[in-house]
């Protein structure tokens, strides 16, 4: 039981660290983002959305699976929360004057990542 609690804490910490990273990367100016991540190839932005949202989903879903035998209720809220967070961040980008803009394809990439993370959390067994 102690190792399960430790694993739950690990997934929770990694998930919140990832959510913090998503928020920072989403809310810094376009110029600062380009200096921070100088990679310039087609769709690097979408790949980032898939990977970061996928990892957050994986971490929180893994945590929910470890905490409860009936994790489907929690997982629905995790998925909904991450989708909502992505939409709110896109709206903030649209309303801000930081050189960032709303992109529906970012929301699609977020959703793909979230559902991939959820699926992997189910398919990959815990220790």
Each language-model region and where it sits:
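Membrane-helix interface segments
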Residues: 9-10, 70-77, 100-104
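Extended, folded domain segments that form the structural surfaces/walls around functional sites
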Residues: 81-85, 105, 122-127
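"…centered on the first transmembrane helix and the immediately adjacent amphipathic helix/loop
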Residues: 1-63, 78
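Short helix-capping/hinge motifs at transmembrane helix termini and TM-loop junctions
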Residues: 28-29, 65, 97, 125
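Interfacial helix-loop-helix junctions of multi-pass membrane proteins
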Residues: 34-36, 87-112
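Residue-level marker of motif borders
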Residues: 40, 44, 81, 85, ...
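Membrane-interfacial alpha-helical segments at the cytosolic side of multi-pass membrane proteins
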Residues: 52-67, 112-125
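Small-polar-interrupted transmembrane alpha-helices in polytopic inner-membrane proteins
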Residues: 15-26, 74-95, 111
